[in-house]
Amino acid sequence: MLSSSSMSSSSLSARFCFNHECFEFKLDHCRPGWRLRSGDFVDLCDRCASAYEQGKFCDVFHQRASGWRCCESCGKRIHCGCIASASAYTLMDAGGIECLACARKKFALGPNFSPSPSFLFQSPISEKFKDLSINWSSSTRSNQISYQPPSCLDPSVLQFDFRNRGGNNEFSQPASKERVTACTMEKKRGMNDMIGKLMSENSKHYRVSPFPNVNVYHPLISLKEGPCGTQLAFPVPITTPIEKTGHSRLDGSNLWHTRNSSPLSRLHNDLNGGADSPFESKSRNVMAHLETPGKYQVVPRFWPKVSYKNQVLQNQSKESESVVTPLFEKILSATDTGKRLVLPKKYAEAFLPQLSHTKGVPLTVQDPMGKEWRFQFRFWPSSKGRIYVLEGVTPFIQTLQLQAGDTVIFSRLDPERKLILGFRKASITQSSDQADPADMHSPFEVKKSAYITKETPGVECSSGKKKSSMMITRSKRQKVEKGDDNLLKLTWEEAQGFLLPPPNLTPSRVVIEDYEFEEYEEAPIIGKPTDVAGSTCTEVEGLLISPTTTKHPRHRDGCTCIICIQSPSGIGPKHDRCCSCAVCDTNKRRRRSLLLRREKKQMEKEDNARKLLEQLNSDNGLHQSANNSENHERHASPLKVQLDLNFKPEKDEESLPGSNKTTKSETLPHDDTVKSSFTSPSSSSAHSQNNKEDEGKLKTTTEIADTTTTSSM
């Protein structure tokens, strides 16, 4: 019963949001919220997760709860008694709390800053470290310490262990049970010495865990349970400042960053066997994307991958500690090398000035040589949104000799906040003297290579497993020094077999130290000998020996195709009409076939036209006959109606004995009257006279009939 009840309760609780004030069902998916003491994240619905990400969770759901305090600087109300708002404030040294906005305005965190658990373990990325890089660079410049703030998504993340100093290892009591020693070193030695010491003390417990995707939320400090206890993942910066030398070399790992200059970078290369990590090329500009606005979700498609080398940023006018952060890159297309350069929309909205009208704003950029260029940054409205372009880039592309396929890299120079526009040629290959130190200091990587190369003296074979796109292409080619050639070992007989005598000349044979050689008066032909005895086709040999024609490279002399027999237009003698050469015969035959084809098409057209005309005539005849029949019926119908309705003499004369004799004579006037009704008005008088005569005759006949009847009686 207990197991069934526990299962039902767990299944029921899994359907609701973790927030007790919310009663929504989690039908499709859930979103992570704050971290629990066990190290897991709570599951929230979309509404609660959105409120938590915006920092308004307690303002919405915990208005009547206790534990509200005010910021000592601005007076903002902060809920101090809730785990959901633990990342919204910091503890002051003299007591009280302060919101993060006021804390960033008053002071910048130094290298000796020991953060509280509420500040570290529950801090979202967008709230804690949005503007710390600017304050950090300004505060450390006075102390002459080259240090950058911690990054949340750094490719090099150190895994430190919590030393269990008691029987209980709960996270709720860090002061008495365990202590986090992450950032405690002297200011004079700097952050690099501190990291080196921490690495030497804890070399058994750290490992590299890169985060390739910047869009996925990663906490600042991640707790993991392992065989050695609870492990703490503390981020380490990746950018190193430029030294005060006036010149700063551009490196292949980061744009204008000195590679392997800090102990952290050297240790990172040692951990990976001198080679780059698989995600190092994708996370070189992670620091720049942390400062982007929250609404822009940039994708790693246009992240700077591998920068270019052997270029100098000339900055001799002033000596300052500057850090160049790569932002994004764009591979030039055929249209980009013209008047304008199309920029990725997400990155243009995130890193470049915001535009309110289509005309745009002028944008000043600096090339790797220190020269400033002025472009026009604008956008075009389209159905799918805006299309951001840089206009006026033709002089820049022509000066640097950029072509389609090359890559332009947009970077930011801090703290001056200048925009740097670099480039990387697609056709430039790295030679062996400029190879990475990882290739020379990791011989075991060559043994694991999947590519087999011939080992010859003076040739350095590169590693077969490269981690970036440019290194993968370079690993497929051998790196050979200038002037070094592959040695080919051959015997005397094999070497003699590659030397052939010139045509139509017989070589003289000389014996030197029991070896027979052939002497040639002219330069021999170097090549593999052919088997002449195996071929018996003389025609094929004649075709091979014959030179090619200028009209068609693959055709030989004597070819009778239509391409080879014709002379070029306007060149060659004119032929008579009765000429019977191959060219004229071919042209006459083609002309005859063309005329026959044309006549056939003309006859087909005429036949089709005649058939169509006959069909139309037959249709017209049928239509005319149908109309005539309809007219005949229309004229005949009124006569039948008058005869049937107006004249019925048989009913009146049925009782008379002489009715049979008189019906015929009596019907005649009726027929005459019917006929007279259809006559024209001009003949009406004639018809009236005829009617009178008929009436007279009718009277006489009736009188005769009466007399006969009376006489019979």
Curated annotation (Swiss-Prot):
One of its GO terms (biological process) is leaf development. One of its GO terms (cellular component) is nucleus. It is found in: Nucleus. Residues 459-478, 616-713 are annotated as: Disordered. Residues 464-477 have a biased composition (Basic residues). Disruption phenotype: Variegated leaves. One of its GO terms (molecular function) is DNA binding. May be involved in plant development. PANTHER family: B3 DOMAIN-CONTAINING PROTEIN OS07G0563300, B3 DOMAIN-CONTAINING TRANSCRIPTION FACTOR VAL3. This is B3 domain-containing transcription factor VAL3. The lineage of its organism: Eukaryota, Viridiplantae, Streptophyta, Embryophyta, Tracheophyta.
